Amino acid sequence: MAQIGVSAMKRIEDLLDIGSFVEIGSYISSRNTDFNLSDKDTPKDGVWTGYGTINDSLVYVYSQDSSVLGGSIGEMHAKKIVALYDMAMKMGAPVIGLIDCAGLRLEESFDALDAFGKIYLAQTKASGVIPQIQAVFGLSGGGMAISNGLSDFVFMEQDKAKVFVNSPNAIAGNSQDKNDFSSAKFQSESTALVDFIGTETEIISGIRELISVLPANNEDDMSYIECSDDLNRTTPELIDRISDPALAMNTISDSGYVLEVKKNYAREMFTGFIRLNGNTVGVVANRRVLYDEKGEIAQEFENVLSHQGSDKAAGFVDFCDAFNIPMLTLVDVKGYRATKCSEKRMPKSGAGLTFAYANATVPKVSLIVGDAYGSAALSMNSKSIGADIVFAWESAKMGMMNASEAVKIIYSKEIDSSDDIKSTLDEKTKEYENLQNSVVYAARRGYVDDIITVADTRKRLIAAFEMLFTKKEDRPYKKHGTI
């Protein structure tokens, strides 16, 4: 058996600033049950709880100890976590959970079940008030996986961590060897749960970085650091990097800082954080190309909205709005993904994305860098659904649909009766593009605020967000939306 508490405590020590951890509830152990848990050594009831600092910022942390009853959730275990949440809510500071949990403690039956519910309630109350981060280092099974889903960001150790509601071996016709859907790879690529995977060291470093870009709570000023980059720096190289927003953001952001979120899931949609003039800004962007670390093309995408990408973006917009983080949207979309699976999910997912943007009251700036066609473009933070500022590059194309497709419908009879179909099609396409798909036309109608050059992108975005810094927007009273 592993030495009690060593891994759980070491993770806390590695995570927090040196010497800053103060433990709370160190004398608590499990309560006696019909199964005589009093005969077992259950120090801290399997979870360390306390507070400390990350880069001098207050955080609350709990770390489950798998050497004590498998780190399972029991009455007193949960009581410690809920008490930690209560304190974090009073102080307006993030809660970080270091997860290594076998799930529900069977020996405690209803008391353990009630304990899980109280953790869920504490997380629900904290949602949108303080950031909630969990990192899974071992098991996170059954009800603990639901707790993962109630968090804002989830990290997962790449080799040993397992997240599941039902074990892969419990699914009819499946086994862990056949399809291990509890693995970090599956959870990060096929679900919308996991934001980051890596080694223990990478996860600890990643949490510290994430804390540095997030506000402490929903009333905190935007996370700010001193900007040493040139606010008027030109960005002509953006034109060659825009197909992969990760590279584009590296060009636009202060000193090239980019933190991509959920980067393994729905890769056709980029979500992440950058800094502009020292302030944290959330970014959503359509992606056409994914480059690997060597700068070679790893994957290409059609510039369409998928239901996975829409859900990913909507969740990110909701988080940024809850914590007053300004939003930048880079638009390059020509429509919706045309598959049977997409048709099953796209109406609801598209509505979710549209609602998230329309409902958000933080500063919202859009930049049209490629295509912006139809209702798919409307959903990507268009002027029509509440964008504060919409910029477009001179090369961008906007409209109801692609010009070549539009003229086939509008001028179908004229094209079919033409002696030279190709010439007629080309002529009508050019005419339609100049009249209806021009960013100049869109700007004249007020759907675009300004047409900017690629080189001026960074400084124009910074100026727009600076102007919007004190934005306040009143909405009709309602308890909450229903989308």
Where are these regions (language model features)?
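Ligand-binding clefts of soluble mixed alpha/beta catalytic domains
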Residues: 1-483
